[in-house]
């Protein structure tokens, strides 16, 4: 996948399904290392939204800014990313 926003990545994580159900790895340090992504988990949240729900932008100014790992566990989601780093060549770009 190619994105307009500099630094935006998609990780393909392990997924296996058989007659018993399925098994998915939701975090794998090696996946981040292969993409040369310095990522350290500080917090983890799970949210369940009803159909048609629109959630707000997530942004923190330094020194509180941090990377985001977004996963859709069931159903589907449209996750929109907006480049707000004014020093980035992709400033103002949008990807989803």
Walk through the language-model features, giving the residues of each:
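Non-catalytic, conserved peripheral segments adjacent to functional cores
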Residues: 1-96
């Amino acid at each position: 996948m190619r994105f307009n926003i500099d630094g935006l990545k998609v990780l393909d994580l392990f997924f296996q399904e058989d007659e018993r159900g399925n098994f998915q790895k939701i975090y794998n340090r090696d996946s981040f290392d292969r993409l040369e992504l310095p990522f350290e988990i500080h917090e983890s949240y799970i949210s369940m939204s009803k159909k048609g729900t629109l959630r707000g932008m997530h942004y923190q100014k330094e020194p509180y800014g941090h990377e985001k790992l977004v996963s859709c566990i069931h159903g589907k989601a449209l996750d929109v990313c907006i480049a707000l780093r004014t020093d980035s060549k992709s400033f103002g770009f949008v990807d989803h």
